Amino acid sequence: MNRKNYISLAKSAANLQIKELKKINKVFNKSFVQAIDAIQYCKGKIIFGGVGKSGLIARKISATFSSVGIPSFFCDPTQASHGDMGQIQKKDLLIIFSNSGNTLELTNMLKFANRFGIKIIGVASKPDSLLLKASDIKILLPKVKESDPTGMVPTSSTSLSMLLGDCLATTIMYNKKFSKEKFKLYHSGGKIGDTLMMSKDIMISGKKLPVIDIKKNFNEALKIINQKKLGIVVVLKKKYVAGLISDGDLRRGMKFLSKKTSLE
């Protein structure tokens, strides 16, 4: 195959997914509104579940929820059958993703939730599936054409599920008037944290600031540098900054330390 065809194939796959993703508008109905309300008014824990690709998507959406102040975590349905079911309690809300809705590994988790009256939001593409039959709120995903040569590999369908999860999160964010200031509280690390950081977040002020009057001597300056542990001292003259002295300056001025030489 000519390498020039690579770009053509990639564009074709991307354009197909873009076309299929427009079907997301079919999901914005009564069930979507019910899901938003259930998430916002949940008095317990918000727990995401899914197996395979759907499980990876559920993990990502759970991470998005937590990063914007909607506490949640992921529970692997397979592990749940081996003891992790104890994480799920009556006031919790389960949000389970499965494209087919008939993944057998979901069976025990669904039975457990139904037995104890735990609310389930099910997300699947088949209305008569195991998942949607067991769910209190049924979000029916539109059928989409996968973008791979076989038409079977989860591509467009996984993108659609991811988009739905992001739409749930952003709708709640808008409703709660989520701001950059709030986001900074939950996402202080990485490039996002750096972008949201303000000078006041790292600024040293008040009693923590190493300052000394210009009439003091080098010995006193050294003492303050050692106490404040910032490697510098700010020299003030009539409450205005006259200069800075670093520990390096003091090392170079060692001959003055034995004297009562004024900093001035």
Where are these regions (language model features)?
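Short, compositionally biased "basic patch" segments
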Residues: 1-12, 51-59
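Tandem CBS (Bateman) regulatory domains
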Residues: 181-207, 242, 246-264
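Short hydrophobic beta-strand segments in globular cytosolic domains
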Residues: 236, 241-242
